[in-house]
Amino acid sequence: GLGSLVYPPMLLLAPVLLFSLAVSLRALSGSSFLALLFGLLLPYWLLLGVGVWFDDVQTEFAPYIEAFQFQKPDYSALSLPQIVTMAYVTLLAFVAMIHFARVAYNDKIRTRMYFYVFILFELVIMGALAMQPQKSDVLLRLYIVNSTPLIAHHFTLGRGRWANIWFGLCLLLLIGVLAFNMGYGKLF
């Protein structure tokens, strides 16, 4: 709701959240559906009030209407630091998803349910990055934030000598990615 005022296509994640509440978390009830609907509509209802107050509703909602006009994917809009960061996070996210699929039985049922939601959002954001790379400034941040619990779960539950070596290698790669991004200019 409120985040979609800053980045309107974030509203497209609402059906994914609704699906997750209904199927993965089994927590969708009438009151939670109304709360979701109210949370999505309240910021726009307040924005409508501002538009009516200033007698210019069309100007208030014009940026939000333009945000949903999708363009063809423009991969030239991606900078080299963004590509390097995306590649690093994608590598870690895929390894973490595979690790979770292999050792999910060790987690409690509720934890598994939450991680299935994280994985679903991960795949949706990956698809959004592939379809709209010109909007990667916001999508990459969402991608990193959503990937963090999966990657942390992987590093926390990884056991053995190879897991320790992999963690050290990932740490060195992270330092390399950060140094590259700092030397190249800016991260985003």
Q: Over which residues does each language-model region extend?
A:
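Membrane-interface catalytic loops of GT-C/OST-like multi-pass glycosylation enzymes that act
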Residues: 129-141, 159-163
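Membrane-interface alpha helices of multi-pass inner-membrane proteins
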Residues: 1-8
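Juxtamembrane membrane-water interface segments that cap and precede transmembrane helices
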Residues: 61-83, 96-100
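Perimembrane helix-loop-helix junctions
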Residues: 13-41
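Membrane-interface helix-loop-helix junctions at transmembrane boundaries of multi-pass membrane enzymes
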Residues: 96-121
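Hydrophobic/aromatic-rich transmembrane helices and adjacent perimembrane loops
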Residues: 136-154
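Membrane-lumen/periplasm interface segments of specific transmembrane helices
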Residues: 32-69
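Juxtamembrane boundary at the C-terminal end of a transmembrane helix
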Residues: 177-188
